[in-house]
Amino acid sequence: MSRRGTVEEKTAKSDPIYRNRLVNMLVNRILKHGKKSLAYQIIYRAVKKIQQKTETNPLSVLRQAIRGVTPDIAVKARRVGGSTHQVPIEIGSTQGKALAIRWLLGAARKRPGRNMAFKLSSELVDAAKGSGDAIRKKEETHRMAEANRAFAHFR
């Protein structure tokens, strides 16, 4: 039993313009070298581009994209008797959102294009429609979990 107190889970703060936690989570993940103002600029430009492309509420597109990419289950390497098994584990909503944001940003960075705002907006629109690299990554993870379902009892 630990003698230290339990750590309270921090709630994500919301961003100054949209008052949205998901936007703030995106900003914190896109951040490089402590340049937060640049990260905010990239996200806000991407949101404007989404608005121009879809002519709908860009935050609903963002929510839909993250909901579409969020995995329900993932695999974790577990060493049992000298061999390593990929054990499927369920993922909580917070961890799932974090993974989804990471996958969306990774897919956006790999895209060819002019700038990050353009690439991110394209990836978010594609993910909201159900296509794109981030969606493919989620499906691949689910396939891995399904293939290794026999090892689920190793949890």
Curated annotation (Swiss-Prot):
Disulfide cross-links: none
Write one Gene Ontology MF term.
Answer: structural constituent of ribosome
Q: Where does the record place it?
A: Plastid, Chloroplast
- Please name the Pfam families in this protein's record: Ribosomal_S7
**What is one process in the GO biological process aspect for this record?**
translation
Q: Which InterPro entries match?
A: Ribosomal_uS7, Ribosomal_uS7_bac/org-type, Ribosomal_uS7_CS, Ribosomal_uS7_dom, Ribosomal_uS7_dom_sf
Chief localization = plastid
Task: Identify the keywords attached in UniProt to this record, alphabetized.
Answer: Chloroplast, Plastid, Ribonucleoprotein, Ribosomal protein, RNA-binding, rRNA-binding
In the record, which residues are listed under signal peptide?
none
Cellular compartments per GO CC = chloroplast; small ribosomal subunit
Describe its function: One of the primary rRNA binding proteins, it binds directly to 16S rRNA where it nucleates assembly of the head domain of the 30S subunit.
* PANTHER family the UniProt entry points to: RIBOSOMAL PROTEIN S7
Query: What is annotated about its quaternary structure and interactions?
Result: Part of the 30S ribosomal subunit.
Family in the record: Belongs to the universal ribosomal protein uS7 family.
Under HAMAP family, the record lists: Ribosomal_uS7_B
Q: What protein is this chain from?
A: Small ribosomal subunit protein uS7c
Organism, per UniProt? Silene latifolia (White campion)
Q: What is the lineage of its organism?
A: Eukaryota, Viridiplantae, Streptophyta, Embryophyta, Tracheophyta
